[in-house]
């Protein structure tokens, strides 16, 4: 039977003394005079499976006693077992780290607690050769080096664990919202609006910008083209969509429209930011999960966010315990304990922005970023609150309206908005959300104050004109969640093929 290494490690007793077929890649091999040991991994499980290969030579059978002994041995053999078909010299020639193999053999228990079972190989076939230039030889490699070979690094123990956890977390999020009665929707990748108001968007165009206003061969043409672009003198009516368009930074506005018809929705897809930052926290392409809920206020929004996070943590601990245990030992001490504690927390703390600011100002800690009312919290502030002061996740609510987006609902004090950020240890802000402004006149006034053209968002205002209601939602940066779940500290290490400033290889 053809099975995976994960199947064997989870329930080895089902396969003892049975002939099985495995495919995988060589992680390591060791040679003795009459034995070859192969560490095989197929990507389904953290640990390698040991394959033992030994050459069996056929003995000449001459006497009646030898004939009888031969037949008795055949009876003792399981009916699945057959003589080895292995030539050690030929096997040694084809074995290289990274090669892909198919192995047929019998799973046998051992007396070694470190290797409780192994495959006694009967046949080994080379599926894909490798050679000495394969960069993942059996030694320790830095993460910086592995980022240069993102197409191969998933074959390491570390990144195999990371991307198995990513898979579990991805489907756990879908599972949570489906169980809660949410509808999954697909929001546009190409958009004409800047939902976040940050202005750091990737623009799309079919116009030949290099030819504006003249060809590059003419002196100063590039400079003139840049000036033309900066003066906004390009006629985008001649472009594909007849206007400026961008890669989306959020699907929130469209999700609001869908929620005000389907009640509860979520979108989960790639988003793009053209931030020229080369830090461990920034990527140009990343994934966002954004739920939107009609008839939902801020406190209900917080409850959904907490339940979602705890559900995902529990699923990852259940399905990827060995992977997280490995990361606990190699990347972040006490990771399992921290995740368990958070998954079992009854109710996350909720603190107002002003209270958080006061805690930081009275901390006697020297921060690089200034603290004053109206200042956004920097990562160092967020980590102080979650790691030093509260030592647990905390919701920061009721933020100054000047530093939050136009669509967030004004509080009665008219100074703050019904916004929330969920801060967690090691990461800082994990989730950002708010109750949305449902009052049409207030929303128009806020757009005017922030100089947001009303004509571009008439459709968004229609959501308030026609049957508007209180509604709320939030955004979860998926890669930040993965940093939190894995104990890693760089966004480039939780995305298979990261796109960052001045870096796009694959």
Curated annotation (Swiss-Prot):
The gene is asnS. It catalyses: tRNA(Asn) + L-asparagine + ATP = L-asparaginyl-tRNA(Asn) + AMP + diphosphate + H(+). Homodimer. Its EC number is 6.1.1.22. It comes from Onion yellows phytoplasma (strain OY-M). One of its GO terms (biological process) is asparaginyl-tRNA aminoacylation. It comes from the Bacteria. One of its GO terms (cellular component) is cytoplasm. One of its GO terms (molecular function) is ATP binding. It is found in: Cytoplasm. This is Asparagine--tRNA ligase. Keywords: Aminoacyl-tRNA synthetase, ATP-binding, Cytoplasm, Ligase, Nucleotide-binding, Protein biosynthesis. InterPro entries: Aa-tRNA-synt_II, aa-tRNA-synth_II, aa-tRNA-synth_II/BPL/LPL, Asn-tRNA-ligase, Asp/Asn-tRNA-synth_IIb, NA-bd_OB-fold, NA-bd_OB_tRNA. Its main location: cytoplasm. Disulfide bonds: none annotated. Belongs to the class-II aminoacyl-tRNA synthetase family. It holds the Pfam family tRNA_anti-codon. NCBIfam families: asnS (TIGR00457), PRK03932.1 (NF003037).
């Amino acid at each position: 039977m053809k099975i995976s290494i994960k199947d064997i490690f989870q329930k080895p007793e089902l396969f003892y003394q049975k002939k099985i077929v495995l495919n995988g890649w060589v992680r390591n091999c060791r040679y003795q005079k009459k034995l070859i040991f192969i560490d095989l991994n197929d990507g389904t499980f953290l640990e390698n499976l040991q394959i033992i290969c030994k050459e069996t030579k056929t003995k000449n059978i001459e006497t009646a006693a030898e004939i009888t002994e031969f037949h008795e041995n055949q009876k003792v053999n399981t009916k699945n077992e057959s003589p080895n078909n292995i030539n050690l010299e030929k096997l040694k020639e084809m074995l290289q780290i990274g090669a892909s193999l198919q192995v047929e053999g019998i799973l046998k228990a051992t007396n070694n607690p470190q290797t409780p079972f192994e495959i006694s190989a009967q046949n080994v076939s080379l599926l894909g050769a490798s050679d000495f230039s394969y960069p993942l030889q059996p030694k320790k490699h830095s993460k910086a080096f592995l980022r240069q070979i993102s197409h191969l690094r998933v074959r390491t123990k570390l990144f195999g664990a990371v991307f198995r956890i990513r898979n579990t977390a991805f489907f756990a999020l879908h599972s949570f919202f489906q169980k809660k009665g949410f509808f999954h929707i697909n929001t546009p990748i190409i958009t004409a609006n800047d939902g976040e108001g940050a202005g750091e968007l990737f623009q799309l165009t079919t116009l030949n910008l290099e030819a504006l206003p003249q060809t590059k061969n003419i002196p100063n043409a590039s400079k003139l083209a840049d000036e033309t672009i900066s003066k906004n003198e390009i006629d985008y009516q001649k472009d594909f969509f007849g206007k400026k368009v961008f890669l989306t930074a959020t699907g929130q506005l469209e999700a609001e429209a869908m929620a005000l018809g389907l009640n509860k929705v979520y979108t989960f897809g790639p988003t793009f930011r053209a931030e020229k930052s080369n830090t461990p926290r920034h990527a140009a392409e990343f994934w966002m999960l954004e739920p939107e809920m009609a008839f939902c206020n801020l406190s209900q929004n917080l409850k959904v966010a907490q339940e979602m996070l705890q559900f995902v943590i529990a699923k990852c601990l259940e399905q990827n315990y060995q992977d997280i245990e490995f990361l606990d030992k190699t990347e972040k001490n006490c990771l399992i304990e921290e995740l368990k504690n958070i998954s079992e927390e009854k109710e996350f703390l909720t603190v107002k922005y002003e209270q958080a600011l006061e805690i930081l100002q009275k901390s006697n800690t020297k921060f690089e970023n200034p603290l004053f009312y109206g200042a956004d919290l920097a990562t160092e502030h967020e980590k102080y609150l979650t790691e030093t002061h509260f030592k647990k996740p905390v919701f920061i609510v009721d933020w100054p309206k000047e530093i939050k987006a136009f669509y967030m609902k004004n509080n009665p004090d008219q100074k703050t908005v019904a916004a929330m950020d969920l801060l967690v240890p090691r990461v800082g802000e994990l989730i950002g959300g708010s109750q949305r402004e449902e009052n049409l006149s207030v929303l128009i006034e806020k757009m005017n104050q922030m100089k947001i053209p009303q004509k571009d968002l008439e459709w968004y205002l229609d959501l308030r004109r026609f049957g508007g209601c209180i509604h709320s939602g939030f955004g979860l940066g998926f890669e930040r969640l993965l940093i939190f779940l894995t104990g890693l500290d760089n966004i480039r290490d939780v995305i298979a093929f990261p796109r960052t400033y001045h870096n796009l290889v694959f």
